[in-house]
Amino acid sequence: MYGLIEHTDEINRLLARYGVKFGIYKNNVFNERLFPFDAVPRIISKDEFDYLERGLKQRVKALNIFLKDIYTKKQIIKDKIIPEEFVYGAAGYMMECEGAVPPKDVFAHISGIDLVQGNDMRWYVLEDNLRVPSGASYPMIARELCRRASPDTFRANTVVDNRNYGDLLRNALDYVNTGGINVVLTPGRFNSAFFEHSYLAEKTGAVFAMPQDLFVEGNVLYYSEYSGKRQRVGAVYRRINDDFMDPMTFRADSLLGVPHIMDAYRAGNVALVNAPGNSVADDKGIYYYVPAMIKYYLGEEPILSNAPTYLPFYEEDMKYVLDNIQKLVIKDVAESGGYGVVFGSELSLERVYEL
């Protein structure tokens, strides 16, 4: 597989030719950049991959039950497995989603779980990313271009094909579809992952729509064609954050949402993929309790461990953090994707005392 390295420049030229881009905002200015390709592969054996798959499925299963529980019965809080302040105080907890249960009870249709392999060669989970995970299209495209640039590499090695993600996503949409077409909903071309939105719409055979293409009537969601004809929508793979999904329910100033889409969702007339309110499970305070969650809901030992984590809510953890802060990475519980990260080794003594 290391034969791919000599094709790095060629693959990057192909990525540029096909316009594989992602966007970033810096100083309130939107810039598009070509997706950077690293030809050095991370080789994972089938046995190791099967182990990871089992662990990830177990974790997502427990998190899915947790999401239904906290928005309905709240049994995990009543049984004092998780302190209520970590649920209700989480930035991602949405009171507007109380009592709302999605079709087939599936909250987390897609997850973007971050893994890291330690010096001990064990795999650890860093983040769960159940809100609006992104990035699946880039390895699919990279694999396609790698095969094109170096077909002999793939003939000589048995490599599992990852290009079936579009089929898997379509199957997930079909499974929860309440009757109607599937839609990929994008906020527009200035979103950082707009390329991916259009790519996944093509690969799933779903209608690629913007918010102005959709409307709700009688608690049913419809897609309006240019001809004026309308089609009922049964499932929406939405790439719009919760706060902006519905100006009638969440942020009233949102220009990206579909008015009353939450009414259609609450009535069980449309599936939203992923379910609104999932971001509570991405909170770093909740992350701390996922191993306990797995034991509580599934009666199983966690297959994959969290990265060693200390929560200053507990006196013992607080003492450890204060004694070892310069060896630790400090994260804001409400942040994700590298935001709000502080490296203890880079802190001045004054900043340590401030924290």
Question: For each of these PLM feature ranges, what is it?
Answer:
Residues M1-L355:
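Preference for protein termini
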